[in-house]
From Swiss-Prot:
Predominant place of localization: cytoplasm
NCBIfam families in UniProt: leuB
Name of the coding gene: leuB
The record's free-text note on cofactor binding: Binds 1 Mg(2+) or Mn(2+) ion per subunit.
Organism, as annotated: Thermus thermophilus
Residues marked Important for catalysis (site): Y139, K185
SMART domains cross-referenced by the UniProt entry: Iso_dh (SM01329)
UniProt protein name: 3-isopropylmalate dehydrogenase
Residues reported to bind substrate: R94, R104, R132, D217
Function: Catalyzes the oxidation of 3-carboxy-2-hydroxy-4-methylpentanoate (3-isopropylmalate) to 3-carboxy-4-methyl-2-oxopentanoate. The product decarboxylates to 4-methyl-2 oxopentanoate.
Length: 345
């Protein structure tokens, strides 16, 4: 169980250390054989090496089985050229590992429905996983360009691109509530027709998982009106970009949202939130997203589904018992982590 740890910038080192405490506790209790090494990344790497994704970090990622990432960026590096910015390091990391599927869970924890912008009765029971295709679609399609008179982009997907992200979604659904909603715009776009047909073909290999199709406009409406009906959503790059951001507001705080990026190389697990330089070093950062990212790592990189659920349950109890400041409580990073560890014991 070899992990490359990239704490990054701002609150990244603090929340990553909280996640590592949880992993170390599990390793001690379960004998996981955890081995990890810390590498500079983002702004911290720029300060040390002059680039955000330096060769020692790149090598560490290549040799690891999973990457646990904190956060990158901050005002200190805002004026740098784009090609050496902390955010470019993140894009380079994903590209180097051919990470084609982004997984973004959005869960409203029991007892915290009041945090959601939705009515409590609508928010109750929400637990949705958005699986977004990361490397194809209109963001990368050619030709693309712009003139004085017009601009153009190309929405393009190959069959293997759709098949592989669909498999990720169906495999995830098998470990959850066994229901996949595939989102497209098949009524007006040929790419949507192709997407739908290909997902259906993949779905035949998963007879235990129910498959439903929705147009993207209907899916957006249902995510707001009745989000608890969703289990796993799979969609293309641009629709996934929009729907995952829409779903991210359902729990009520970015501090609750983990993510995973999966592909051919080393998978990356990271909080959705940014580096929050305004609270860095104050000991008040909410480590929930980082701890849940570690739980996703246990599940998706190492197949330890039961341990991942154990971590999620401990976090849910800690959120009710000692909520952090961004959720209306007063528990600092260390105090909240201690509560999680107590419930894991």
């Amino acid at each position: 169980m070899k992990v490359a740890v990239l704490p990054g910038d701002g609150i990244g080192p603090e929340v990553t250390e909280a996640a590592l405490k949880v992993l170390r506790a599990l390793d001690e209790a379960e004998g996981l054989g955890l081995a990890y090494e810390v590498f500079p990344f983002g702004g911290a790497a720029i300060d040390a090496f002059g680039e955000p994704f330096p060769e020692p970090t790149r090598k560490g990622v290549e040799e690891a089985e999973a990457v646990l990432l904190g956060s990158v960026g901050g005002p200190k590096w805002d004026g740098l050229p784009r090609k050496i910015s902390p955010e470019t390091g993140l894009l380079s990391l994903r590209k180097s590992q051919d990470l084609f599927a982004n997984l973004r869970p959005a869960k409203v924890f029991p007892g915290l429905e009041r945090l959601s912008p939705l009515k409590e009765e609508i928010a109750r029971g929400v637990d949705v996983l958005i699986v977004r295709e990361l490397t194809g679609g209109i963001y990368f399609g050619e030709p693309r360009g712009m003139s004085e008179a017009e601009a153009w982009n190309t929405e393009r997907y190959s069959k293997p691109e759709v098949e592989r992200v669909a498999r990720v979604a169906f495999e995830a659904a098998r470990k959850r509530r066994k229901h996949v909603v595939s989102v497209d715009k098949a009524n007006v776009l040929e790419v949507g027709e192709f997407w739908r047909k290909t997902v259906e073909e993949v779905g035949r290999g998963y007879p235990d998982v129910a498959l439903e199709h929705q147009y993207v406009d209907a899916a957006a409406m249902h995510l707001v009106r009745s989000p608890a009906r969703f289990d796993v959503v799979v969609t293309g790059n641009i629709f996934g970009d929009i729907l995952s951001d829409l779903a991210s507001v359902l729990p009520g705080s970015l501090g609750l949202l983990p993510s995973a990026s999966l592909g051919r190389g080393t998978p990356v697990f990271e909080p959705v939130h940014g580096s929050a330089p305004d609270i860095a070093g104050k000991g008040i950062a909410n480590p929930t997203a980082a701890i849940l990212s570690a739980a996703m790592m246990l599940e998706h990189a190492f197949g330890l589904v039961e341990l991942a659920r154990k971590v999620e349950d401990a976090v849910a109890k800690a959120l009710l018992e000692t909520p952090p400041p961004d959720l209306g409580g007063s528990a600092g990073t260390e105090a909240f982590t201690a509560t999680v560890l107590r419930h894991l014991a």
